[in-house]
Regions:
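Active-site mouth loops of central-metabolism enzymes
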Residues: 11-19, 91-101, 159, 209-215
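A conserved active-site cap/scaffold subdomain adjacent to cofactor or substrate pockets
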Residues: 105-126, 131-132
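N-terminal beta1-alpha1-beta2 module of alpha/beta enzyme domains
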Residues: 1-5
Length: 215
């Protein structure tokens, strides 16, 4: 096993969960693996209406995202004298929070709260530069972070040759095309001819979404 690699969540969609439940779950992880857990928080529901109903959540849940982040932060932090609700385990673990986003909203919120910001380039690569700029402009130092800290989520394909890497890349290209079409499924295997899979319009849209890709 490892003893230093940081682990945690690349994305808990907080509107789908109670801050109390997340505090207890990640408090458990932080108790088992002290100082090794990170918690990334997203605002998007990340699912359809039926699944939202099954989770007993509604589309309006995302409106409370800033309040939920602050509540979660308080539950994971040092308990206050008048605090009546406690997450056990969780309380006092101070699990580092990240704000995940692909919009200017997330960038502003992360900056205002003094939290690190992770940008999802595969959703809105065109907004990346502006989002990072706004985050840095709006950043306020906090107990967790003294200066801005940005992470960019991008696609990196590694193989023996660039030709092999580009063939492997046809798997996410197909998957994103399916997403554009509104269909779901497992990650498809690579294909020799991606051009026969998508239409010119789909190619343009998917290629735009996957701009931040490196071989």
């Amino acid at each position: 096993g490892t003893s230093v690699i940081r682990v945690g969540a690349g994305g808990i969609m907080l509107p789908n969960h109670s801050p109390m439940v997340i505090a207890e779950q990640f408090g458990t992880l932080a108790t088992l693996f002290p100082n090794r857990i990170d918690l990334g928080l997203g605002r998007a529901p990340g699912t359809d209406q039926r699944t939202l109903q099954a989770l007993r959540r509604g589309p309006e849940s995302s409106e409370y995202f800033p309040q939920d982040v602050l509540e979660l932060q308080a539950l994971l932090g040092t308990p206050q004298e008048n605090q009546s609700i406690h997450a056990i385990p969780g309380e006092g673990t101070n699990v580092p929070l990240w704000i995940l986003g692909s919009s200017l909203y997330g960038a502003q919120l992360a900056g205002m709260l003094g939290l690190p910001y992770a940008f999802a380039s595969h959703f809105a690569p065109q907004a990346m530069a502006q989002a990072v700029s706004i985050y840095r402009e709006r950043f306020e130092p906090s107990a967790q972070l003294s200066k801005p800290h940005v992470m960019i989520g991008c696609n990196i394909i590694v193989a023996d040759t660039e030709e092999d890497a580009r063939k492997l890349f046809t798997s996410p290209q197909q998957q994103f095309t399916r997403m554009v079409r509104g269909t779901r499924g497992k990650l498809p295997p690579p294909v020799d001819d991606i051009e026969s899979f998508w239409s010119p319009a789909e190619k343009e849209q998917v290629s735009s979404m996957l701009t931040c890709s490196f071989f």
